[in-house]
From Swiss-Prot:
Regulates autophagy by controlling the spatial distribution and levels of the intracellular phosphatidylinositol 4-phosphate (PtdIns(4)P) pools. Modulates (PtdIns(4)P) levels by regulating the ER-to-Golgi trafficking of the phosphatidylinositide phosphatase SACM1L. Keywords: Autophagy, Endoplasmic reticulum, Membrane, Transmembrane, Transmembrane helix. The gene is tmem39a. The lineage of its organism: Eukaryota, Metazoa, Chordata, Craniata, Vertebrata. This is Transmembrane protein 39A. Its main location: endoplasmic reticulum.
């Protein structure tokens, strides 16, 4: 009414000081007692939404069965056999002949032009492909042998002899290749390692100091930093690439505090990035030496099907990528990432004026936020998406971590989709192939792909039933905080 006393507007009510969610979520209040005490000093203060009074339910995890996994030695053996078969297929594609023609021509008396092949190059490629298997075999022998001075000396002698033999073979092949090829072609032999050193050895995941290749010095409060030894970085990365194994075993303990959850996420994120780096490097290295390097040493007068050879290169890289991903990211490791993502949660950024009538809170790093709560952080408005949210709203890496792993079967479904696409395409190419080398190469590669696809589908079937089971059932022994 004109001249009357105006009451507080709707916007003033919605933006009035509300009790902090720290006192409401997990704060030990019951039936809104704390709210009634605070509301006596605020005129016309409406009750906060129901979601602010609900304590987030403890996160329940599905317990997955123990699936059979290939040992490191068995996996490296299977990977080496696959790469050797792929190398044989590439040589067939390059040096094939019309062997059914008249035998009057010496080059047509066999199915391949063996006189055009470089045996030293083939030996060099085979040694480079077997580096992981040799190192894994030596590591397994060291673990299996008892701890005694005599065994230690014998293992040391065996290691020195094996590594010396491999080095001598590489030097012998390089010397013969140097005599018969130009320096430009020889540069292709070590090109992957020349790229790996500046891209990977100089970048260490983890803390910011480690990212730049620096280590803490023994100064006051660790304020001074020293550059880490380049040879140390190179030795650590080469040992990791040679062995292909991870000595650090991560476990999920359902940490109670948000700080511990974010710390666990950081550790798992660093370990996951290291595994992905290993997968990418080794898959690209395998495809490079198997399918690309033989093409670099083909004589200019030699004719071969460029399209088919490049297609084989892509297929080898995809298959090696899937094999390494399935081995380095096993089901129990993906389940570990999923459990951590369930505790982390995610924030969705909103427009500042989209929820003006909804209570908004100031984000706190020591609070576990329930789903649907609106918080302000760094002058931006965010909405809690997960049922359990402790992530930093402005941290994009937390959002990516939750997106990748909050669904436990996402990575496995992606790998199955990639492998199924490759198998279907190869079957289609096999039906349309008219040349004997195409039929032979597709048949050999498909046998290897069937084994990989079988393991992926088996894991998907078992894990799908385990994760689809109701979480409240006691039959599966559900784990909760």
């Amino acid at each position: 009414m004109p001249g009357g006393r105006r009451g507080p507007s709707r916007q003033q009510l919605s933006r009035s000081a509300l009790p902090s969610l720290q006192t409401l979520v997990g704060g030990g209040l019951s039936n809104g007692a704390g709210l009634r005490c605070r509301s006596s000093s605020a005129v016309g203060l409406s009750a906060p939404p129901l979601t602010a009074l609900i304590t987030p339910e403890p996160v329940r995890h599905s317990r997955i069965p123990d699936l059979p996994l290939d040992s490191n030695l068995l996996f490296e053996t299977l990977l080496l056999l696959y790469l050797l078969v792929a190398l044989l297929v590439q040589y067939i594609n390059i040096y094939r002949t019309v062997w059914w023609s008249s035998y009057s021509q010496p080059t047509a008396s066999t199915s391949l032009n063996f006189h055009l092949m470089d045996a030293h190059l083939a030996v060099f490629i085979a040694v480079m492909l077997s580096r992981r298997l040799v190192w894994t075999l030596l590591s397994e022998v060291c673990v299996a042998c008892p701890a005694s001075p005599l065994c230690y000396v014998l293992l040391l002698v065996v290691r020195v002899c094996v590594l010396t033999l491999c080095g001598w073979v590489l030097c012998w092949t390089l010397l013969n290749l140097f005599r018969s090829h130009s320096v430009l072609k020889l540069l292709f032999l070590g090109y992957p390692f020349g790229v790996y050193v500046p891209l990977c050895c100089l970048h260490q995941d983890g803390s910011p100091a480690a990212d730049c290749g620096f280590a803490d010095a023994d100064g006051a409060d660790g304020a001074l930093l020293q550059p880490r030894d380049f040879l140390t970085l190179l030795r650590e990365n080469l040992r990791q690439q040679l062995s292909g194994t991870h000595t650090h075993t991560h476990t999920h303990t359902c940490p109670p505090s948000p700080e511990l959850i974010r710390s666990e996420v950081q550790q798992l994120k660093t370990d996951f990035n290291r595994r992905i780096k290993e997968v990418l490097f080794n898959s690209l290295l395998s495809a490079y030496y198997v399918a690309f390097l033989p093409l670099c040493f083909v004589k200019s007068t030699q004719y071969y099907d460029m399209r088919w050879s490049c297609e084989h290169l892509i297929m080898v890289w995809i298959n090696a990528f899937v094999m390494l991903m399935s081995h380095l990211l096993p089901p129990h490791y993906c389940d570990l990432l999923h459990r951590c993502a369930a505790h982390l949660g995610r924030w969705q950024r909103l427009e500042p004026g989209s929820c003006s009538n909804t209570p908004q809170h100031t984000w706190s790093d020591s609070t576990i936020w329930p789903q649907g709560v609106l918080v302000r952080h760094s002058r931006c408005l965010y909405k809690a998406v997960g049922p359990y949210n402790v992530a930093l709203p402005s941290d994009v890496s937390h959002a990516r971590f939750y997106f990748l792993f909050h669904k436990p079967l996402r990575l496995l479904n992606v790998l199955i989709g990639i492998e199924c696409s490759v198998v279907v395409y190869q079957l289609y190419s096999l039906l349309r192939s008219e040349r004997w080398n195409h039929t032979l190469s597709l048949g050999l590669i498909l046998v290897c792909n069937y084994y990989v696809l079988f393991k992926l589908l088996r894991d998907r079937l078992v894990l799908g039933k385990a994760y689809s089971h109701p979480l409240g059932s006691a039959g599966l022994g559900m784990k909760r905080d």
